[in-house]
Amino acid sequence: FDVKLNDSPLTIVQPDLLVICDKNKLDGKRCNGAPDFIIEIISPGNPADDYIRKLYYYKNADVREYWIVDPHRRTVPVNFFEQDILNIQYFFEATIKVNIYDDLYIDFSEIDVLLN
């Protein structure tokens, strides 16, 4: 699913998982503007894309929260841009709060069991 972060054609991305709270951003083909929450799962071939390029794009496009799930390192760096909180490291044993919601948590220990 394409996400056009701004007017530049260079900022069309395809996040692994995204949450869009404003349905007006959807036009039937893509999301026009920043999603509220994005999770990218690191692919072994190009981790810099998620750790550097997309981090830069998402922060500047006003994505509220961005997680990077790294199955190889078994880490989840959390970036809560809305509060200028960057790169808080969690491990797969943790239950992590989705900061943009009051009562939403993701239990990575359960995901870790599925990966092993």
Tell me what each language-model feature is.
Residues 1-61, 68-116:
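C-terminal interaction segment
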